[in-house]
Amino acid sequence: MTHMPETPLLDQVHYPSDLRKLEDRDLPQLAREVRDEMIDAVSRTGGHLGAGLGVVELTIAIHNVFDTPNDRLIFDVGHQCYPHKILTGRRDRIRTLRQEGGISGFTRRAESEYDPFGAAHSSTSISAGLGMAVAADLDKTDRRVIAVIGDGAMSAGMAYEALNNAGALDARLIVILNDNDMSIAPPTGAMSAYLARLASGRTYMGFRDLGKKLTAYLGKNVDRAITRAVEHARGYVTGGTMFEEMGFYHIGPIDGHSFDHLLPVLRNVRDNAQGPVLIHVVTQKGKGYAPAEAAADKYHGVNKFDVITGAQAKVKPNAPSYTSVFADALVQEATFDDKIVGITAAMPSGTGLDKLQEVFPKRCFDVGIAEQHAVTFAAGLAAEGFKPFAALYSTFLQRAYDQVVHDVAIQGLPVRFPIDRAGFVGADGPTHAGSFDTTFLATLPGFVVMAAADEAELKHMVRTAAAYDLGPISFRYPRGEGVGIEMPERGQILEIGKGRIVKQGSKVALLSFGTRLADSLAAAEDLDAAGLPTTVADARFAKPLDHDLIRQLASHHEVLITIEEGSVGGFGSQVMQFLASEGLLDNGLKIRTLVMPDIWVEQAKPEVMNAMAGLDRAGIVQTVFKALGRSLIVGAAG
């Protein structure tokens, strides 16, 4: 049995107000105890470990110096928010992290007043923080706003748009750049700490503000001269940076694991800053836990693990994951076609494109957290005759919708979109669910929209996409493992807009789009047993629809049910539109569309989410019985 860590000091800290009562000399011990608590909690639930371990001292220092929740603290993405949750009244629930009915793995406004802005997608914190800082100025309050953003998230254009706007507005915004990959510049010991304290002190910050006041008083003619004077003085202390060019007062880099470095700088900024300030803090992912320090990439997101050894619990899969099937199929197709290239937005491992990178390093591109750029970059490649596969999670494709419409679809460019994590994703909840891709892609003229029913179908769709050059094409597939069917040596090229009948019946028709096919077949067994001979069809395409297949199903069955793991407005709506336009609803056809519910579905296991949505075997059977006006016999649904 695993024992709970001993945390005598942390036991006294329920909220940041308790933390502020501690002496500075007590904070290193508190940091050790927070780390122990976090490691133990995540070992039981799984979650994002490395990022949170890297910001323990920083989180404690911020809550110690600033008056949260009155002062607003925003974490970008949210992977690093676990220490924050422990210190803000949620320690008693930290072992429910990412579990059904438990607390979120990200910041959530509905969860705590200490979470002023929700996060899960990258690079939003500075924009949100700027909005809050401007609101504080308009309200004439002295409320401070702190945005903590990692160096990875700073690769997205949105972060720079916000920095540029904040500098132009001269907003009272504090941005803390958490450089946990040493990717910008390392701190240089005692001298770096001294210079950071000096630069954040009253004298130098006052000189900067004096320069701004003189500019306002004397006019724009002297603006350039005063700016040069301020930069000259600052250059002796820290040197100029691009952040200074954008209007930010830049401090650092400083050691993000040293309270002796963090506290003086944060207090100076709290007491003296008037305009936008950027503090560059260098941290180490996984700090304080040896296995995570040694392999940061393996401890970013973890399963349950043994605290002593660091060994993660891994369930042996019954079938290959959809991601790995896609990756292997793409590598296979790339060996036959040297025009195939892969594009990922900072997710090479998550999308499986790391396999393509290993085999064809010059034909695989990681563009950083920049989905908008990724899509238009792919469009440029397609315009020159290449076959780009822009592999994105469904939830992140949302960030690039204008580029999909304007740069790809309107021009009819043959960009291929492998859409991973389609449907429910489990512990990451509504922010990462792949709900909307079918809906927003199937509305676009000339777009081919597919969904794989199983891993063999996915292999067919990779080859089909590689062969299709008439316009944009997408294929969606879920997180997790396949159903364990026999795999073809190589995928087949599917006929565009043609589905297939998998099982023939006569009274009920189940038309599945995507991986709900397995549950549809299981439901058909129960319906057959109840005297309702059931046809099961795999649509394959939401656009173009298989009109002949839909006419056949509608004309020869009493009940037609569409099933998809997607939002309202998707495949089922496309089918309904066609049926209505063809007059196929005029003769008493009973049609029902099963989709993800029109709510934000909270975290749970995917199978629980599908059951709640009525997308599982039992839910499909129940929908058929209701459509027929019959009572469901107990046990009829398996």
Curated annotation (Swiss-Prot):
Q: Transferase: present as a keyword of the record? A: yes
Q: How is the cofactor bound?
A: Binds 1 Mg(2+) ion per subunit.
Q: Which UniProt keywords apply?
A: Isoprene biosynthesis, Magnesium, Metal-binding, Thiamine biosynthesis, Thiamine pyrophosphate, Transferase
Instruction: State where Mg(2+) binds.
Output: 151, 180
Q: Which reaction does it catalyse?
A: D-glyceraldehyde 3-phosphate + pyruvate + H(+) = 1-deoxy-D-xylulose 5-phosphate + CO2
- Necessary cofactors: Mg(2+); thiamine diphosphate
| The protein's Enzyme Commission number | 2.2.1.7
Gene Ontology molecular functions: 1-deoxy-D-xylulose-5-phosphate synthase activity; magnesium ion binding; thiamine pyrophosphate binding
> Which Gene3D superfamilies did the record assign?
3.40.50.920, 3.40.50.970
BP terms from Gene Ontology: 1-deoxy-D-xylulose 5-phosphate biosynthetic process; glyceraldehyde-3-phosphate metabolic process; terpenoid biosynthetic process; thiamine biosynthetic process
TM regions (residue ranges): none
Q: Which pathway does the UniProt entry assign to this protein?
A: Metabolic intermediate biosynthesis; 1-deoxy-D-xylulose 5-phosphate biosynthesis; 1-deoxy-D-xylulose 5-phosphate from D-glyceraldehyde 3-phosphate and pyruvate: step 1/1
- InterPro entries assigned to the protein according to its UniProt record, in alphabetical order: Dxylulose-5-P_synthase, THDP-binding, Transketo_C/PFOR_II, Transketolase-like_Pyr-bd, Transketolase_BS, Transketolase_C, Transketolase_CS
Q: Where does thiamine diphosphate bind?
A: 79, 120-122, 152-153, 180, 289, 371
Q: Which NCBIfam families match?
A: dxs, PRK05444.2-2
Subunit and partners:
Homodimer.
Query: Main role?
Result: Catalyzes the acyloin condensation reaction between C atoms 2 and 3 of pyruvate and glyceraldehyde 3-phosphate to yield 1-deoxy-D-xylulose-5-phosphate (DXP).
Q: Which family does it belong to?
A: Belongs to the transketolase family. DXPS subfamily.
**What protein name does the entry list?**
1-deoxy-D-xylulose-5-phosphate synthase
Which species is the source of this protein?
A: Rhizobium rhizogenes (strain K84 / ATCC BAA-868)
Phylogenetic lineage: Bacteria, Pseudomonadati, Pseudomonadota, Alphaproteobacteria, Hyphomicrobiales
